Amino acid sequence: MASQREENSTQMQNEVVELAYSLARCKLENLLNKSMRIRMTDGRTLVGLFLCTDRDCNVILGSAQEFLKSTDSLSQGEPRVLGLAMIPGHHVVSIEVETESLQTTTHGL
């Protein structure tokens, strides 16, 4: 009887993990092709469209632009066009999704 309870407990834990994984996946899928701003450990900021991520939290941005950290707090200077960029997960400090990008939805026919 105790082994039955342990088995049920393990099964419930597995279901909770699967549900959490499914919810996280849905949130990530909703962010696909949305404009993101990623701040990195070296002070650079990359802005581009979120294309994908992996289990190591690396992020791929499309149409990416790089902004260097400026010593002058009023200007960031001209962006450098990167195109497709891979940001290693361990270099990510923060990720912001542009609200305009979240409000815009595309409807397929």
Swiss-Prot record:
Gene Ontology CC terms: cytoplasm; NatC complex; nucleus
Any one of the GO BP annotations: negative regulation of apoptotic process
Keywords for this protein: Cytoplasm, Nucleus
One Pfam family hit: LSM
Primary site of residence: cytoplasm
Domain Sm per the UniProt entry, residue ranges: 23-101
UniProt GO molecular function: RNA binding
Annotated SMART domains: Sm
Annotated signal peptide: none
Localization terms from the record: Cytoplasm; Nucleus
InterPro entries reported in the protein's UniProt record: LSM_dom_sf, LSMD1_Sm, Sm, Sm_dom_euk/arc, snRNP_SmB/NAA38-like
Function: Auxillary component of the N-terminal acetyltransferase C (NatC) complex which catalyzes acetylation of N-terminal methionine residues. N-terminal acetylation protects proteins from ubiquitination and degradation by the N-end rule pathway.
Subunit structure: Component of the N-terminal acetyltransferase C (NatC) complex.
PANTHER family linked to this entry: N-ALPHA-ACETYLTRANSFERASE 38, NATC AUXILIARY SUBUNIT (PTHR10701:SF5), SMALL NUCLEAR RIBONUCLEOPROTEIN-ASSOCIATED PROTEIN B AND N (PTHR10701)
Similarity section: Belongs to the snRNP Sm proteins family.
Protein name as it appears in the record: N-alpha-acetyltransferase 38, NatC auxiliary subunit
UniProt organism field: Danio rerio (Zebrafish)
